[in-house]
Amino acid sequence: MNKKAYFGEFGGSFVSELLVPALRELEQAFDACLKDEKFQKEYFRLLKDFVGRPSPLTLCQNIVSNPKVKLYLKREDLIHGGAHKTNQALGQALLAKKMGKTRIIAETGAGQHGVATAIACALLNLKCVVFMGSKDIKRQEMNVFRMHLLGAEVREVNSGSATLKDAVNEALRDWASSYKDTHYLLGTAAGPHPYPTMVKTFQKMIGDEVKSQILEKENRLPDYVIACVGGGSNAIGIFSAFLNDKEVKLIGVEPAGLGLETNKHGATLNKGRVGILHGNKTYLLQDDEGQIAESHSISAGLDYPGVGPEHSYLKESGRAVYESASDAEALEAFKLLCQKEGIIPALESSHALAYALKLAQKCEEESIIVVNLSGRGDKDLSTVYNALKGGLK
């Protein structure tokens, strides 16, 4: 057993024989790039000059009424592409180029990973094909248009629930027959080894930056670090720097959708059971017969019935706790951040903010809370408009 492939009992590489050589080649190339100074230098140059890192850490001025609480936002909404997805899309695309691949395939839910992949492919002159569920295409028309503008081909997926998990299935199918010239640029910290580790590595600068920024501003570490969790890449990116700092509480916030008591949610770690999906062992939403259940969230990027295996491990070990926020709570947090701070957040990030605002009200001691504002909300404006029927009161 490859111990590097596992986080406790979670992770692994449960794939068809056809994909074994592709994953082996990828793991070897990834391990080599970690030691390759030229690769690292080029990647960090692009993060600085093209992506716009480091992203700011912003202290909220008005949204928190409790005088004992300072709420900071890690502003991934301000980087090129509008979300944290660009960090790792660029890392993987650069790796693919180094491997001699000429074609990139990706899956996308909210469209942000598709846009980030299209951006990276345009920059590095790689052919780009993005698989997207028909349900998500309707929800995210502007991101589909962005992908087309950036030169990507968007392939509509109608199978299953026509959402993210089905787009992943189609991408894996394509890769099984095309891996000689194609890299599958998986969008979250899930899937078969080495993807969870690779995606975490290409997102860990979020947590590294927060750590140095908060020490500079406050001369101490935060009490809480909070991030939304769908697949979990933005969360593992910010958590990674604090895993050994036991005094820092790590909180992932899942989509409770219409309520955890309904079957219309995406709270995999709160309501799921352990199983295998998309090549890794992790918590999954399942029905009574063990089939993968459909997830629901107002946010397309959290609408996934699985979660990255390291989050399953962090839950089991108790190092992180996983809470949830409903569609209604996320919408309310979205409105509040717009009106109180002048920042339009992604609906995904609004789930983390919703929980952070509830927590802030309860804090009885001086507390510092950091929320990963994983993306901006331009893509969600029509969803929010329809949900609120155009009214903001």
UniProtKB/Swiss-Prot annotation:
Q: Which GO terms describe its molecular function?
A: tryptophan synthase activity
* Keywords, sorted A to Z: Amino-acid biosynthesis, Aromatic amino acid biosynthesis, Lyase, Pyridoxal phosphate, Tryptophan biosynthesis
Q: List the disulfide bonds.
A: none
**What is the scientific name of the source organism?**
Helicobacter pylori (strain ATCC 700392 / 26695) (Campylobacter pylori)
Indicate what this protein is called per its UniProt record: Tryptophan synthase beta chain
Q: Where N6-(pyridoxal phosphate)lysine occurs along the chain?
A: 85
Q: What is its EC number?
A: 4.2.1.20
Q: How does it assemble?
A: Tetramer of two alpha and two beta chains.
What cofactors does the UniProt entry give for this protein? pyridoxal 5'-phosphate
UniProt lists the gene as: trpB
Family assignment from sequence similarity? Belongs to the TrpB family.
- Which SUPFAM superfamilies would you find in this protein's record? Tryptophan synthase beta subunit-like PLP-dependent enzymes (SSF53686)
List, alphabetically, the PROSITE patterns matched: TRP_SYNTHASE_BETA
Instruction: Name the pathway.
Output: Amino-acid biosynthesis; L-tryptophan biosynthesis; L-tryptophan from chorismate: step 5/5
